[in-house]
């Protein structure tokens, strides 16, 4: 049996990779089967819970909701200003990645993981913004629905008849530190 012998450089690279992983933030995804099941609500409730335990929590971007209970949960959280821009005569409000990196909280809330950013943003997709936050050592809570996962998109579309264009690579979901399923009881 041949023994594989690694060079000292190989081991140094492995040690450096481990150091980077130790400094990387953790991703928690609030995962649902459809819009309106309460993902943002659950994320905000969890944020208030960890804040009570002394964690520095900031709302980076929360999708505006017509649900009063969800909107009320933003109260008591520091909210970063959105990045506002004009595009084709429309005013767009986006997650402000630079403000988040400058503030550098322990935990940031960023709704809608699969969102496609406006052209003024550094990254095309919100999951890329979140990746940058994680690499900066910031923990992230976010939300996503099953149909936005690349490998499940076609299957969900064949059942629902609805094709979504905003998707995340499976690797983003697979690399999450924690996934919390959020669902509601079917109506009788």
What is each PLM-predicted segment?
Residues 37-44, 48-57, 120-121, 140, ...:
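An amphipathic, basic-hydrophobic helix/alpha-beta surface used to engage anionic
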Residues 108-110, 139-146, 175, 182:
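Structural recognition of the conserved hydrophobic beta-strand(s) that form the central parallel beta-sheet
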Residues 9-23:
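Pre-Walker A adenine-sensing motif
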Residues 112-127, 151-154:
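Conserved ATPase-coupling elements of RecA-like P-loop NTPase cores
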Residues 147-188:
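Conserved phosphate-handling catalytic cores of large alpha/beta enzymes
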Residues 56, 104-107, 133-142:
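Loop/turn-to-beta-strand initiation segments
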Residues 24-102:
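Conserved P-loop
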Residues 63-68, 114-115, 140, 146-151, ...:
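Conserved nucleotide-binding/hydrolysis micro-motifs of P-loop NTPases
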